[in-house]
From Swiss-Prot:
Record-given protein name: VQ motif-containing protein 13
Region (Disordered): 1-26, 56-90, 133-204
Predominant place of localization: nucleus
Pfam families in UniProt: VQ
PTM sites of type Phosphoserine: 17, 73, 128, 147, 173, 196, 200
Chain positions with Phosphothreonine modification: 131, 177, 192
Gene name, Swiss-Prot/TrEMBL: VQ13
Annotated Low complexity bias: 16-26, 143-152
Keyword field contains Nucleus: yes
Length: 204
């Protein structure tokens, strides 16, 4: 039935042409209240028909409300009052004027100033007194320099001679020990066994 020439002519008359859209397509309203439109057209004009039905009309019936600006519009910049402008201008003037009077000298041209308690106005703070020099207990007059006329041998000479001859250091010993005796070497381990004393009969 749909392939008969008579049906084709009838359907062709009902289809809207790309140049004019005066023909109203068939619309069906279902129970769910969603409008459905069925349109038949040939493949060559399908693209133009879709653009005519879904595109933006040349004379839109819906005009935007001028009271409500569009969503993507940029809000206008609020004008700044003259008072704020004058205050900011004065602030910039003060900053510019301060630059001319700013003077920084990181290096001192004169000699360095010595800070003392008097200059710092601290009368309670006094400089510590000099520590008196104490006699060096390790200092011996004849150890560093000895005149050739002095024939008395020094302690260092005796020590060096004893090292070469005896092989040990000579240290000053107490006055009770004779100076000429060699130091007695103590053994770390006993040479003879140490026996414990026999138990007495009173221990039982």
């Amino acid at each position: 039935m749909e392939k008969s020439p008579r049906y084709r002519d009838k359907a062709k008359n009902l289809l809207p042409s790309p140049s004019s859209c005066t023909t109203t397509p068939t619309r069906y309203v279902k129970d769910d209240m969603y409008e459905t439109t069925f349109i038949r057209t040939d493949p060559s004009s399908f693209k133009q028909v879709v653009q005519l039905l879904t595109g933006i009309p040349k004379n839109p019936t819906h005009q935007p409300d001028p009271r409500f600006p569009p969503f993507h519009s940029i809000p206008p910049i609020k004008a700044v009052t003259n008072k704020k402008q004058s205050s900011s201008f004065r602030l910039s003037e003060r900053r510019n004027s301060m630059k001319h009077y700013l003077n920084i000298n990181p290096t001192h041209s004169g000699p360095p100033e010595i800070l003392t308690p008097t200059i710092l106005n601290f009368p309670a703070l006094d400089l510590s007194p000099d520590t008196p020099l104490m006699s060096d207990p390790f200092y011996r007059p004849g150890s560093f320099s000895q005149s050739p006329s002095d024939s008395k041998p020094s302690f260092d000479d005796d020590q060096e001679r004893s090292i070469k001859e005896k092989g040990f250091y000579l240290r000053p010993s107490p006055s009770t020990t004779p100076r000429d005796t060699e130091p007695r070497l103590l053994s770390l381990f006993p040479m003879t066994p140490i026996h414990s004393p026999a138990p007495s009969p009173h221990d039982h």
